[in-house]
Amino acid sequence: MNFFDVCVTIVTLPLFYTFAEKMAKNLTHTAVLKDKVILITGGTGFLGQKLIQKLLDIGTPRKIIIFSRDEFKQHEMGQSLSDPKGKLRFFLGDVRDLARLERAFKGVDIVIHAAALKQVPALEYNPLEAIKTNILGTQNVIDAALNNNVKKVLLVSTDKAVNPVNLYGATKLCAERLLVAANAYRKNEKIAGFSVVRYGNVIGSRGSIVEILERQKDSGLVTLTDKRMTRFWITGEGAVELVLDALSLMKGGEIFIPKLKAMMLKDLLKTVAPNCKVKIIGIRPGEKIHETLLTSDEVRRTRDIKNHYLIEPEHDWWKTEHLKNFSYVPTDFSYTSDKVRHLKPEELKSMLTL
């Protein structure tokens, strides 16, 4: 059994892990991260903070570098996190600045690229800013990683990149394509290279509907765009686990997608603000009624690896021997938020308390 098989055996466990299974997963992550220097772009964001806390809890990385442009958030983060072993480093910078990235990436083993502009309505009215950060910034990350021989680069992407109807999704689709294509420029095939994780909305993240509803409910009136609207949801903890699993499994070029449940937004309103009146305001620019995590074209090269799906790249450098024990999904497979199982109210409540 090779390393990939061992990792898959450990990370593709049932949704609700036993204590022993959680220990097995943690051992895998511990081994992959041992003595590594890890840099997270956008490290002061919601995912970055969750991820950094997890890395500190694991304890085996040699150094954790938070790369972001907001010095106050870095200050707050430094004050709030317990770092008795002095593993944290804060690096002010913007992914638009290649020279700054070049300096930050010196000696780095793993880069998790989470920096992005993501507020859909704002980006519709500021398109060039979205392109500068989400596309050109991603290319800067790639160039800096290649020039510094970074072993692994993992892009954090979104379901908005699938059949995009807004600028945010289009920029993330471009970022995904750039990451996958970058593997052709690897100097050493033994280096894992560049891969992607793609998931849905993160419960409780900054600017999410949960945050909006929490602000609105005190007034007794909450807003809903469309009663039919559905969304994929993942907890912050689930997003962190996906990132760590991908770092354990990646060979370079894959897109990792978790198996998620979805929900109707009207059910979320009933859970978060059960006693409030609801005002229907209509879909905002760039929104969909339902989201999807796989295009029909991607289905034909997607494998089911238990708790995740893995999209294979369409490049001649891609090797599949390590995946021979995992089947492709059916050709008529569809992964959309209106067709997967929807969360029950009690499940929603449980996720909201995580």
Set out the residue ranges of the language-model regions.
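Strand-loop microenvironment adjacent to phosphate/nucleotide-handling motifs in alpha/beta enzyme folds
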Residues: N26-K36, V141, N147, R177, ...
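Conserved Rossmann-fold cofactor-binding substructure of NAD(P)-dependent oxidoreductases
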Residues: R89-I110
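Conserved Rossmann-fold NAD(P)-dependent oxidoreductase catalytic core, especially the SDR/UDP-sugar
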Residues: H113, L117-P121, Y125-L173, R177, ...
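Conserved residues in the N-terminal Rossmann fold of short-chain dehydrogenase/reductase
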Residues: S68, F91-L92, K132
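Rossmann-fold scaffold of SDR-type NAD(P)-dependent oxidoreductases
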Residues: T41, F105-A114, L155
